[in-house]
UniProtKB/Swiss-Prot annotation:
The chain crosses the membrane at residues 1-21, 56-76, 86-106. Its EC number is 7.1.1.2. It catalyses: a ubiquinone + NADH + 5 H(+)(in) = a ubiquinol + NAD(+) + 4 H(+)(out). It comes from the Eukaryota. It comes from Branchiostoma floridae. It is a multi-pass membrane protein. Core subunit of the mitochondrial membrane respiratory chain NADH dehydrogenase (Complex I) that is believed to belong to the minimal assembly required for catalysis. Complex I functions in the transfer of electrons from NADH to the respiratory chain. The immediate electron acceptor for the enzyme is believed to be ubiquinone. One of its GO terms (cellular component) is mitochondrial membrane. Belongs to the complex I subunit 3 family. Keywords: Electron transport, Membrane, Mitochondrion, NAD, Respiratory chain, Translocase, Transmembrane, Transmembrane helix, Transport, Ubiquinone. The keyword Transmembrane helix applies. The gene is ND3. It is found in: Mitochondrion membrane. Its main location: mitochondrion. This is NADH-ubiquinone oxidoreductase chain 3.
């Protein structure tokens, strides 16, 4: 328990230090030259700010969610080996899988996984 207290204390101190450093650093003043596109000293060939596909963003967010699911399920075998309450752990993992399966079905039925616009 003492090591957890140390970790929380160090993390809190690090957050406070980074916030204070960020407040005291000079802010960057954007001007016309900094906002313009730069291609090795030549005039840009086209627009540097292309429109971003919202579908791609949605698929990327879904990938992150399901990647997080895998990261949460990976420690499950260790929980089975080192825990006496495996029945509880099993149902927690099954609940996580069921919730994410329903979320995937919802996205699929709403057309969130269709790539064409």
């Amino acid at each position: 328990m003492l090591s957890l207290t140390y970790i929380v204390g160090i993390a809190s101190a690090l957050v406070i230090i980074l916030l204070l450093v960020g407040l005291h650093l000079p802010s960057v003043m954007p001007d016309n030259e900094k906002l313009s596109a730069y291609e090795c000293g030549f005039d840009p060939m086209g627009n540097a700010r292309l429109p971003f596909s919202l579908r791609f963003f949605l698929v990327a967010i879904l990938f992150l969610l399901f990647d997080l699911e895998i990261a949460l399920i990976l420690p499950y075998p260790l929980g089975v080996v080192f825990s006496e309450n495996t029945f509880y752990n099993y149902w927690l993992v099954m609940l996580l899988v069921v919730v994410l399966t329903f979320g995937l079905m919802y996205e699929w039925l709403k057309g969130g996984l269709e790539w064409t616009e």
